[in-house]
């Protein structure tokens, strides 16, 4: 199959029929240049699924070096307004009453039968503003439905944000070479603002792997190519490679996937 991206043709066994219903990311062209061998689709957006010849080769590189991952498919659901805390509380058994600004929570979302519908990372940006960095389901529609049904005073949107992950034991040295020594003080599952090309961008110490790593919540599609190239050039010193969620690494870390593989609607958070 030929997958076309703005003049770039990529032979793939992914089985995808490309259309406007499948969204590209700011990094898609760089991902193709880096040698991606296939894609899957999460939240209606492309997610690279393989680069290396084997998953074992990818695992050993990830556990010893650093990788750059296009995880733009982690769409953000922004909930803002005077009732934002009330709505976010309603969607999960985990309380956010004492959640500080700048913190990330693993946040299992449940339906009316307490079944799992998503397991996002929750970020608190201000007293009345939250981001849900979601796995593969339509959380935006679920949140809007609850807000309308409860007559809550909130504004719910999908912001122009495209996460890029830097994972692996050398990720801290790589990131500090670009964003400064301040980033070394960032604790696990916390975030802060860092400057890039004259803009303020959120970076969290988190990621899909059990390795040390960071996620850059890039605001602005147009900055994607520059961000990738900046990290790639700086990363050559640290044996950087393109990557994607690795099944061996995730199983070792006890990191389950929503997407109806390990966790689905009949699954309760206490199981």
Stretches with model-predicted labels:
Residues 70, 209, 263:
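Conserved adenylation A10 loop of the ANL superfamily
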Residues 2-107, 115:
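Acidic, proline/glycine-enriched N-terminal capping motif
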